[in-house]
Amino acid sequence: MKRVAVIAGAGPAGLTAAWELLARTDVHPVIIEPTAAIGGIAQTYVHNGNRIDIGGHRFFTKSERVMNFWLSMLPRQGAPAADDVAFGHDVELATEVVLRHLAPEAAADRRIREERRPAPDPEREDRVMLQRPRLSRIYFSRHFFPYPLGITLMVAWRLGLLNTALITLSYLWAKAFPRRDETFLDAFFINRFGRRLYETFFHGYTEKVWGVKCSEIRAEWGAQRVKGLSLKRAVIHAIHDLLSSDFSKEQHRRETSLITRFWYPKYGPGQMWETVAEQVRGAGGEIRQGSRVVGVRLANGRVAGVRVREEATGRVEDVACDYFFSTMPVRELVAMVEPAPSSAVREVAAGLRYRDFLTVGLLLNRLHVLEKGRLPRASVRDNWIYVQDAGVRVGRIQIFNNWSPYLAADHENTVWIGLEYFVGQGDDLWRMADADLVQLAKREVEQIGFARGADVRDGCVLRMPNAYPAYFGSYENFDEIRRWVTSIPNLFCVGRNGMHRYNNQDHSMLTAMMAVDNIVAGCEDDSALWTVNLEMVYGESGS
């Protein structure tokens, strides 16, 4: 009888696990996805032909295994995209590509099929990965500042010479007398950037993102998001960029926050995961959308089955399984396991916290960026803009045209942006009506001098619960849960929410790949999965 793996969630980790199982084992994957969307937080949401990337997903990794997976699903572009020539993008065009396909379910063998073909033209074909310039800046007091920050002449001029001098002295003081205890995020940032720069740029924004004080957030979040970056390193990389243009070599050595180019699907991250889902289904895997895992049954120390509820009808089915991959929030998983784990595990799980997220999409005739000392600008080239102003609630702005021109239905005549708000379920923004949120977004882009409300042609709202696992609450005792998970040999917690870790999608994929490695090898020790993304060097563990 064929072995079965139930996979909770059709996001990057869940779909990668299903694809790997079909490619390398005789295990039948059954993905249970409560929504109608594919990709989880990496889905692409479509509103009137305009596409939203929820939170922004750059396809960048130092794992060759992950990169090969991506480029075998969506191959590199072989000709310029719609805006490459107009904006002078420096793009490395491919000539020939190799695509990989799972063999159809009816095939006599399950080998991966490879296809060599000319590299696609994004103006003529859809299945293509674009190479895009990375530009993210901080917008503060109607000035743009580089992200990550480095003290350059331009930055010094915009901050003011006195403020720059005080920032420099503060940084030198932090280097000479670093805080010994880096348990929490405030000390982590101060030791790398100095107190004055921390208070100017990091403190308010970070508390806007998480809704709690930096002194209450564990430093692991900072370590994962800035990857060994410091003010000194930012300055060194800025100088080095003037002397080198070798993209491929420099990217491998570079901290995540400093990458200069990245890969991106023509129609956003959801296109990648819809492609993977199509292959999974074609090879015989199941993806049950509109169904939710509501119970996990243990027997003899292993997962024996899961209870699945069909959301439309309420019908509940018990699905027996040999393996269970969970990408659901750990708090939910622990609460539904029968028999229940120890009170210590349940207590830690109940205390885990999450930050929720909503995006307000605005379709504009044009931008109207009021930068000090410049005439109003109708466009800027940023992918993301970090909004530091304390007087508005928006945290970031995405300009979707700059991720891929094809995200905007009419990229030549409109600008499609997303205002990102970090919220909690039940707070005023989360409960606000969509029409009121669109009006708030219109007011705020005008207030910060980024666009005019009169230029807004359309708007929409997209909510994403449990988007970011938080490094406060009971997180300091998370090892209690990890030890419990690893004691169940056929339970694999993978992905961002599955591990309660702020992973990028490549890290989430690696955890799924490594879990399947264990199944192939007959290994029941999954401790290696929990080392992915712990290193200060980005992604080296999976290379």
Protein language model regions, located:
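C-terminal lid/capping helical subdomain adjacent to the catalytic/cofactor pocket in oxidative enzymes
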Residues: 450, 460-462, 471-543
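Glycine-rich FAD pyrophosphate-binding loop
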Residues: 22-47
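Active-site/ligand-binding neighborhood in enzyme catalytic cores
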Residues: 143-145, 152-155, 159-160, 164-299, ...
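Conserved mid-domain beta->alpha element of the FAD-binding
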Residues: 179, 322, 326-333, 428-437, ...
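Mid-domain catalytic core of redox enzymes
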Residues: 24, 265, 289-431, 435, ...
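Conserved Rossmann-like nucleotide-cofactor binding loop
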Residues: 13, 37, 331
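N-terminal Rossmann-like FAD-binding beta1-loop-alpha1 element of flavoenzymes
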Residues: 3-31
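Dinucleotide-binding Rossmann-like beta1-alpha1 core, especially the glycine-rich loop
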Residues: 48-175, 227, 231
